[in-house]
């Protein structure tokens, strides 16, 4: 059978399994098994399956994944969202948009220790939505800023999505982590800039400022954020200075999260075991997907489909910018049907050869992928952040999707910025790992 025929058979099989509700990991394993039947030389599919699943699961780099997930689960069950709102609100009261900026900053802070977009969105929305509604803030901007800012959970390290990409693309997790810091700040500035512009254009829809507080009172309100800020600085410096590997940083992050939960009085045996079980469920799901993706990628490599596809795309002589534009459209389309991790594991084996041929750095491409995954998080019908806010606000899905639309286009702008100015992404990895 020709490579085109093999590709069609595998795509139809995978699509059928996913449409039938089969678990993504199982669908990938089944498609990989089918792909091995087309491999030349009679390579035993069972032996390759055992080798790839074990090799993928026993990776030292992947040991960071359950730890980062657990760290986010621990903090998700603390009073952190309440303390962040109270601690940040007094400092932002005089900026146009006022407390709407708390959504952006709080999501940025929590995202830097949670690694999950949905957890970040849910944690901040839990306290922010009632407070903003009570003060009379516009529902659409409140929902949109939470949907958009919630995506910072996977852009500002540590990030579960970044770990998955780094393992799939065989690049340094630490370098991908470091590459995400400045783009994360750029996205936060874009979000806050939009809120300022909207507020200035709609002053009648912005509530009056809260009564002013003295500097001493502001410090007292922000005091409980100090342990969290110290944890963020410690993780960042450990990565930048090379004091610890990503897995070691994750372990220290778990200990720091437990300490913060104890500090807030939220660490009980029930909450501890709930966080353990929550992290275990998420990790098992992701590990099964990664095992299936690894097996399917190997089977596709044996058939020669990715290399042939990369060669075919190369015949179009696309410029680097045109290739990135085409990939952006492809990922946005995939994001309407798949979650971010599934998008990464399904496309990495095919896309990486094209990216290498175009001369892009794989660390830079990792941040590009994270940004387009963020777009998927706020794209109907399967955007996780939209589901979270729909549940927490009681609004219908169309309303939440419309509210998030301006922030979707801000993410498109962020992709354009890092494409034109790639040093925004690469400066920290180059500082930490000079050539």
Where do the PLM segments sit?
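Alpha-helical transmembrane segments of multi-pass membrane transport proteins
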Residues: 1-435
């Amino acid at each position: 059978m020709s490579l085109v025929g093999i590709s069609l058979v595998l795509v139809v099989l995978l699509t059928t399994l996913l449409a039938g509700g089969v678990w993504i990991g199982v669908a990938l394993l089944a498609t990989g098994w089918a792909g091995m039947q087309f491999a030349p030389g009679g390579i035993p599919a069972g032996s390759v399956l055992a080798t790839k699943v074990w090799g993928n699961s026993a990776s030292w780099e992947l040991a960071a994944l359950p730890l980062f997930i657990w760290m986010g689960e621990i903090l998700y069950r603390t009073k952190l969202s309440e303390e962040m709102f109270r601690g940040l609100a007094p400092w932002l009261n005089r900026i146009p948009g006022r407390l709407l900026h708390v959504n952006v900053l709080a999501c940025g802070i929590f995202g830097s220790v949670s690694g999950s977009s949905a957890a970040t969105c849910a944690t901040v929305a839990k306290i922010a939505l009632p407070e903003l509604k009570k003060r009379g803030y516009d529902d659409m901007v409140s929902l949109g800023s939470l949907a958009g800012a919630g995506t910072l959970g996977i852009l500002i390290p540590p990030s579960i999505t970044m770990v998955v990409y780094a393992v799939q693309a065989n690049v340094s997790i630490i370098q991908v982590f470091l590459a995400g810091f400045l783009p994360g700040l750029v996205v936060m500035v874009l979000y806050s800039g939009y809120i300022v512009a909207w507020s200035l254009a709609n002053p009648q829809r912005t509530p009056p400022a809260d009564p002013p507080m003295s500097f001493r009172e502001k410090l007292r309100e922000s005091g409980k954020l100090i342990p969290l800020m110290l944890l963020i600085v410690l993780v960042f410096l450990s990565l930048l200075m090379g004091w610890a590997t990503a897995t070691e940083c994750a372990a220290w992050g778990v200990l720091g999260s437990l300490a913060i939960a104890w500090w807030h009085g939220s660490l009980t045996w029930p909450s501890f075991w709930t966080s353990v079980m929550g992290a275990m469920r998420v990790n098992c799901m992701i590990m099964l997907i990664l095992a299936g993706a690894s097996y399917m990628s190997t089977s596709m490599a044996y058939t020669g489909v990715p290399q042939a596809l990369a060669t075919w795309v190369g015949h179009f002589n696309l410029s680097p910018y045109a290739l990135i534009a085409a990939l952006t459209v492809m990922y946005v389309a995939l994001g309407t049907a798949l979650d971010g991790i599934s998008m990464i594991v399904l496309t990495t084996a095919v896309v990486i050869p094209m990216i290498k041929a175009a001369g892009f750095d794989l660390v830079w491409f990792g941040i590009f992928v994270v940004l387009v995954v963020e777009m998927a998080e706020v794209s109907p019908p399967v955007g996780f952040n939209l589901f979270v806010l729909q549940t927490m606000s009681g609004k219908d899905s169309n309303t939440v999707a419309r509210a998030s639309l301006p922030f979707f286009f801000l993410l498109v702008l962020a992709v354009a910025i890092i494409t034109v100015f790639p040093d925004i992404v690469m400066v920290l990895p180059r500082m930490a790992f000079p050539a």
